[in-house]
Amino acid sequence: MTHFPSQNSTPSPAPTARRHDLDALRAFAMLLGIGLHAGLAYAPIPWIAMNRETSPALGAFVEITHGFRLPLFFLMSGFFSAMLLQRRGIRGFLRHRAKRIGLPLLLGMVTVIPAMWAVIIGGNIVVGVTPPPQREWSVPADDAPNIWSAAASGDLPTVQRLVQSGAPVNEPDPRVYTLPLAWASIGDNAEAVAFLLESGADPNRRMGDDNTPLHTACFFGAADSAALLLDAGADLGARNKGGETPIDSMRHGRGAVDFIANLLGVTADYEKVEAGRREIARLIESLPARSETGDQPSPVRDAIAGLVRGELFMHLWFLWHLCWLACALALATALLRTLRFRGVPPLLISTPVCLFALIPLTAITQSWQSGFGPDTSAGLIPAPRVLAHYAVFFGFGALMFTGRDAADRLGRAWWVHLPIAALAGACALRLTHEPLAFAETGLNASTAARLEPILQAVFVWTASLGLMGLARVLLSAPSERVRFVSDSSYWLYIAHLPLIVAGQFALAYLDLPPFAEFALLTGVVTGLLLLSYRAFVRYTWIGRLLNGPRPRPGAGLQPREAPGLARVSTPTRAETG
């Protein structure tokens, strides 16, 4: 029977062997975020500074990395948090978390986040004065016209001809999973919207993120299209995976409209969008059955929704989630101690047994997300569906520490896990973007929607366990270089995003291949931040705050050991998990 950490409130003096491999793996997950954010400029995903050229390979890299990176990080964080909790006890654990996570988060809020906003505002001003070349791709189209491109362009004769020829009016396009009704609504092509509705298009059909065509019409201020959709029975109370109704979608500002328009390859005049939204709002207010939609104005609900949907923490949101999960772990430990919980059988933490519970549980929480991988929640109140998803990984990481002998064997079959992860990830990613990709096998869109989160769960767990096993093979021995990179990863991740976005704005004017720009940006930013860490962080108060004290080379002092890096008897490591 394995024991839950810190069943006693007092610290345990027993040392814990250093886990070089898991600490390096946690740093790897954090540093991957630099490449992920750099690659977003070239992926078909809304982003702050989007390049004129896209790269399918970089887009796949971004999505696959996003699919496992933070789950892996939270898995490692749960392990090291349980280790720290055992050593320090509940009170010491919470004090340490406040110092190593809460305080850096607060400092980042008054330094890094304002710098980020300055880069965004400055970049948009420069781009507004001298816009870079636009992306050259748009509505998904083959050489021959299709129902989606015809609806988007408002080409009514072509829409009519295609529908009469059997084109599907209720199927999303295979590229961005958008319905013909929504494509027609983006440009407020009312005649096309009316014809599609007459031809059987469902105004309440869901798309990616569980949006409906009415969400799209309201977002883009397509007043005529919105009126037609409402007349056809579109549900004003329909909520997408972000909890937004069509009315909520009208609250997004210019930046969001520009992002989505660029993603879809269309143009949007924000003044016209705002005017259309005002007209839609007047139309909704005039509806006699407004009270039946279930979307009555609620200042309290709107305020809470705003706190959930906000971008307060930007890329530092994961630290805020760690604060919540650390408190939950301390509370669970106190409760289990009161209940005299003896622990879980080691068998339940071993493979493949643990996967029989982890994969279904993760598939459920993944089904609450809006695409491939987990969603982001950067508001003051974490979105429950996002926090719950990461809690699965954090919680199992804590259980891994309680059953260290079993946990040590988790990734031994990494040579099996990683190929399974590659196959499951490829299939899940394909189904995310093309629900009918395997239609020839009899897999319809409804079945694909149920299968996709299961495949994603298989992907993320086999990838995580496989990387754990590979790290144990390659990184178990101590290494000064690996230790330095591991220590620096916290600083690099906190500070990287303003530099990345500034570089993306600058590179938008160059005519380099996407891979060359990506490599240049990632390499320069990483190099500069490593130099800054060595010169200005590692041996200063910033380094002591993030990582604990580190002696200068030749000082003749040995660094105190740290949880997750060394024996836990005298922890000083900036435990970000």
Where would I find each of the regions flagged by the language model?
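TPR/TPR-like (Sel1-like) alpha-helical repeat modules
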Residues: 231-237
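Ankyrin repeat A-helix N-terminal signature
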Residues: 149-155, 183-189, 216-222, 249-257
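Alpha-helical transmembrane segments and their immediate juxtamembrane cytosolic regions
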Residues: 2-141, 216, 229, 289-577
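Ankyrin-repeat boundary/"N-cap" motif
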Residues: 139-149, 163, 172-183, 206-213, ...
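Ankyrin repeat structural motif
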Residues: 155-163, 189-197, 222-230, 256-262, ...
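Ankyrin-repeat-protein effector appendages
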Residues: 140-149, 232, 251-293
